[in-house]
């Protein structure tokens, strides 16, 4: 929260515009919801973007933007809308206005919380020493850091042969670092797939561990 305050304040002071992508804002399943930078800015220095793709269906391709009226007015004049399905858009509007979307989100939080806990338990049970991971309070993902000497980029081909997949760490770094890291998703997998997948991942990591050199 302190970093959000600092960034919003900096944007206000310097006349900057922050684009805040908060796709998982409604999927926090532990602790209180954090304030957005949009809500913290005193001078309208933040545009807040959200989406229905994480809470209803990715295929809807529907989202929203909140910001200062003058900025939204400019964005509205430049918009194009040639591919939107008006029928599904109307259904999404009905889903939200009737309160069913809020009920649905509440159910999703319970589902994703249970899946997250199961994946965390499987990581604790299966992964070799030296592996660490985050314990998320919302969203879809767990960030894993592999033991020293294991490269997530080099390992991915073997992992896929073992029927498990992930996104290597360098995909999230502008400088290409993070090769010991990877991102796992628990959103679209069953309980059985979580246990089987983490078991396969652990076996893959163990096979990639550096071989210890014998000493006299």
Annotate each PLM feature.
Residues 110-120, 131-145, 155:
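Conserved glycine-rich beta-strand-loop-beta hairpin in the small C-terminal domain of fold type I
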Residues 42-110:
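Conserved core segment of the aminotransferase class I/II
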């Amino acid at each position: 929260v302190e970093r959000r305050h600092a960034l919003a304040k900096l944007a206000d002071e310097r006349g900057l515009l922050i684009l805040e992508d908060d796709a998982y804002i409604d999927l926090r399943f532990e602790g209180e919801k954090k304030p957005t930078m949009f809500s913290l800015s005193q001078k309208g220095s933040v545009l807040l973007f959200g989406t229905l793709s994480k809470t209803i269906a990715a295929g809807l391709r529907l989202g929203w933007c909140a910001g200062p009226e003058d900025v939204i007015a400019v964005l509205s004049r430049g918009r194009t809308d040639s591919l939107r399905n008006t029928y599904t858009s109307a259904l999404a509007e009905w889903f939200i206005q009737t309160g069913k979307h809020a009920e649905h989100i509440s159910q999703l939080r319970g589902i994703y919380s249970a899946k997250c806990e199961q994946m965390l338990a499987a990581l604790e049970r299966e992964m070799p020493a030296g592996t660490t991971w985050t314990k998320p309070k919302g969203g879809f993902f767990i960030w894993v850091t592999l033991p020293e000497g294991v490269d997530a980029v080099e390992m991915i081909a073997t992992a896929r042969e073992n029927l498990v997949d992930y996104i290597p760490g360098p995909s999230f770094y502008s400088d290409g670092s993070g090769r010991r890291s990877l991102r796992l998703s628990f959103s679209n997998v069953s309980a059985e797939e979580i246990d089987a997948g983490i078991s396969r991942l652990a076996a893959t990591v163990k096979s990639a561990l550096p071989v210890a050199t014998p000493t006299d």
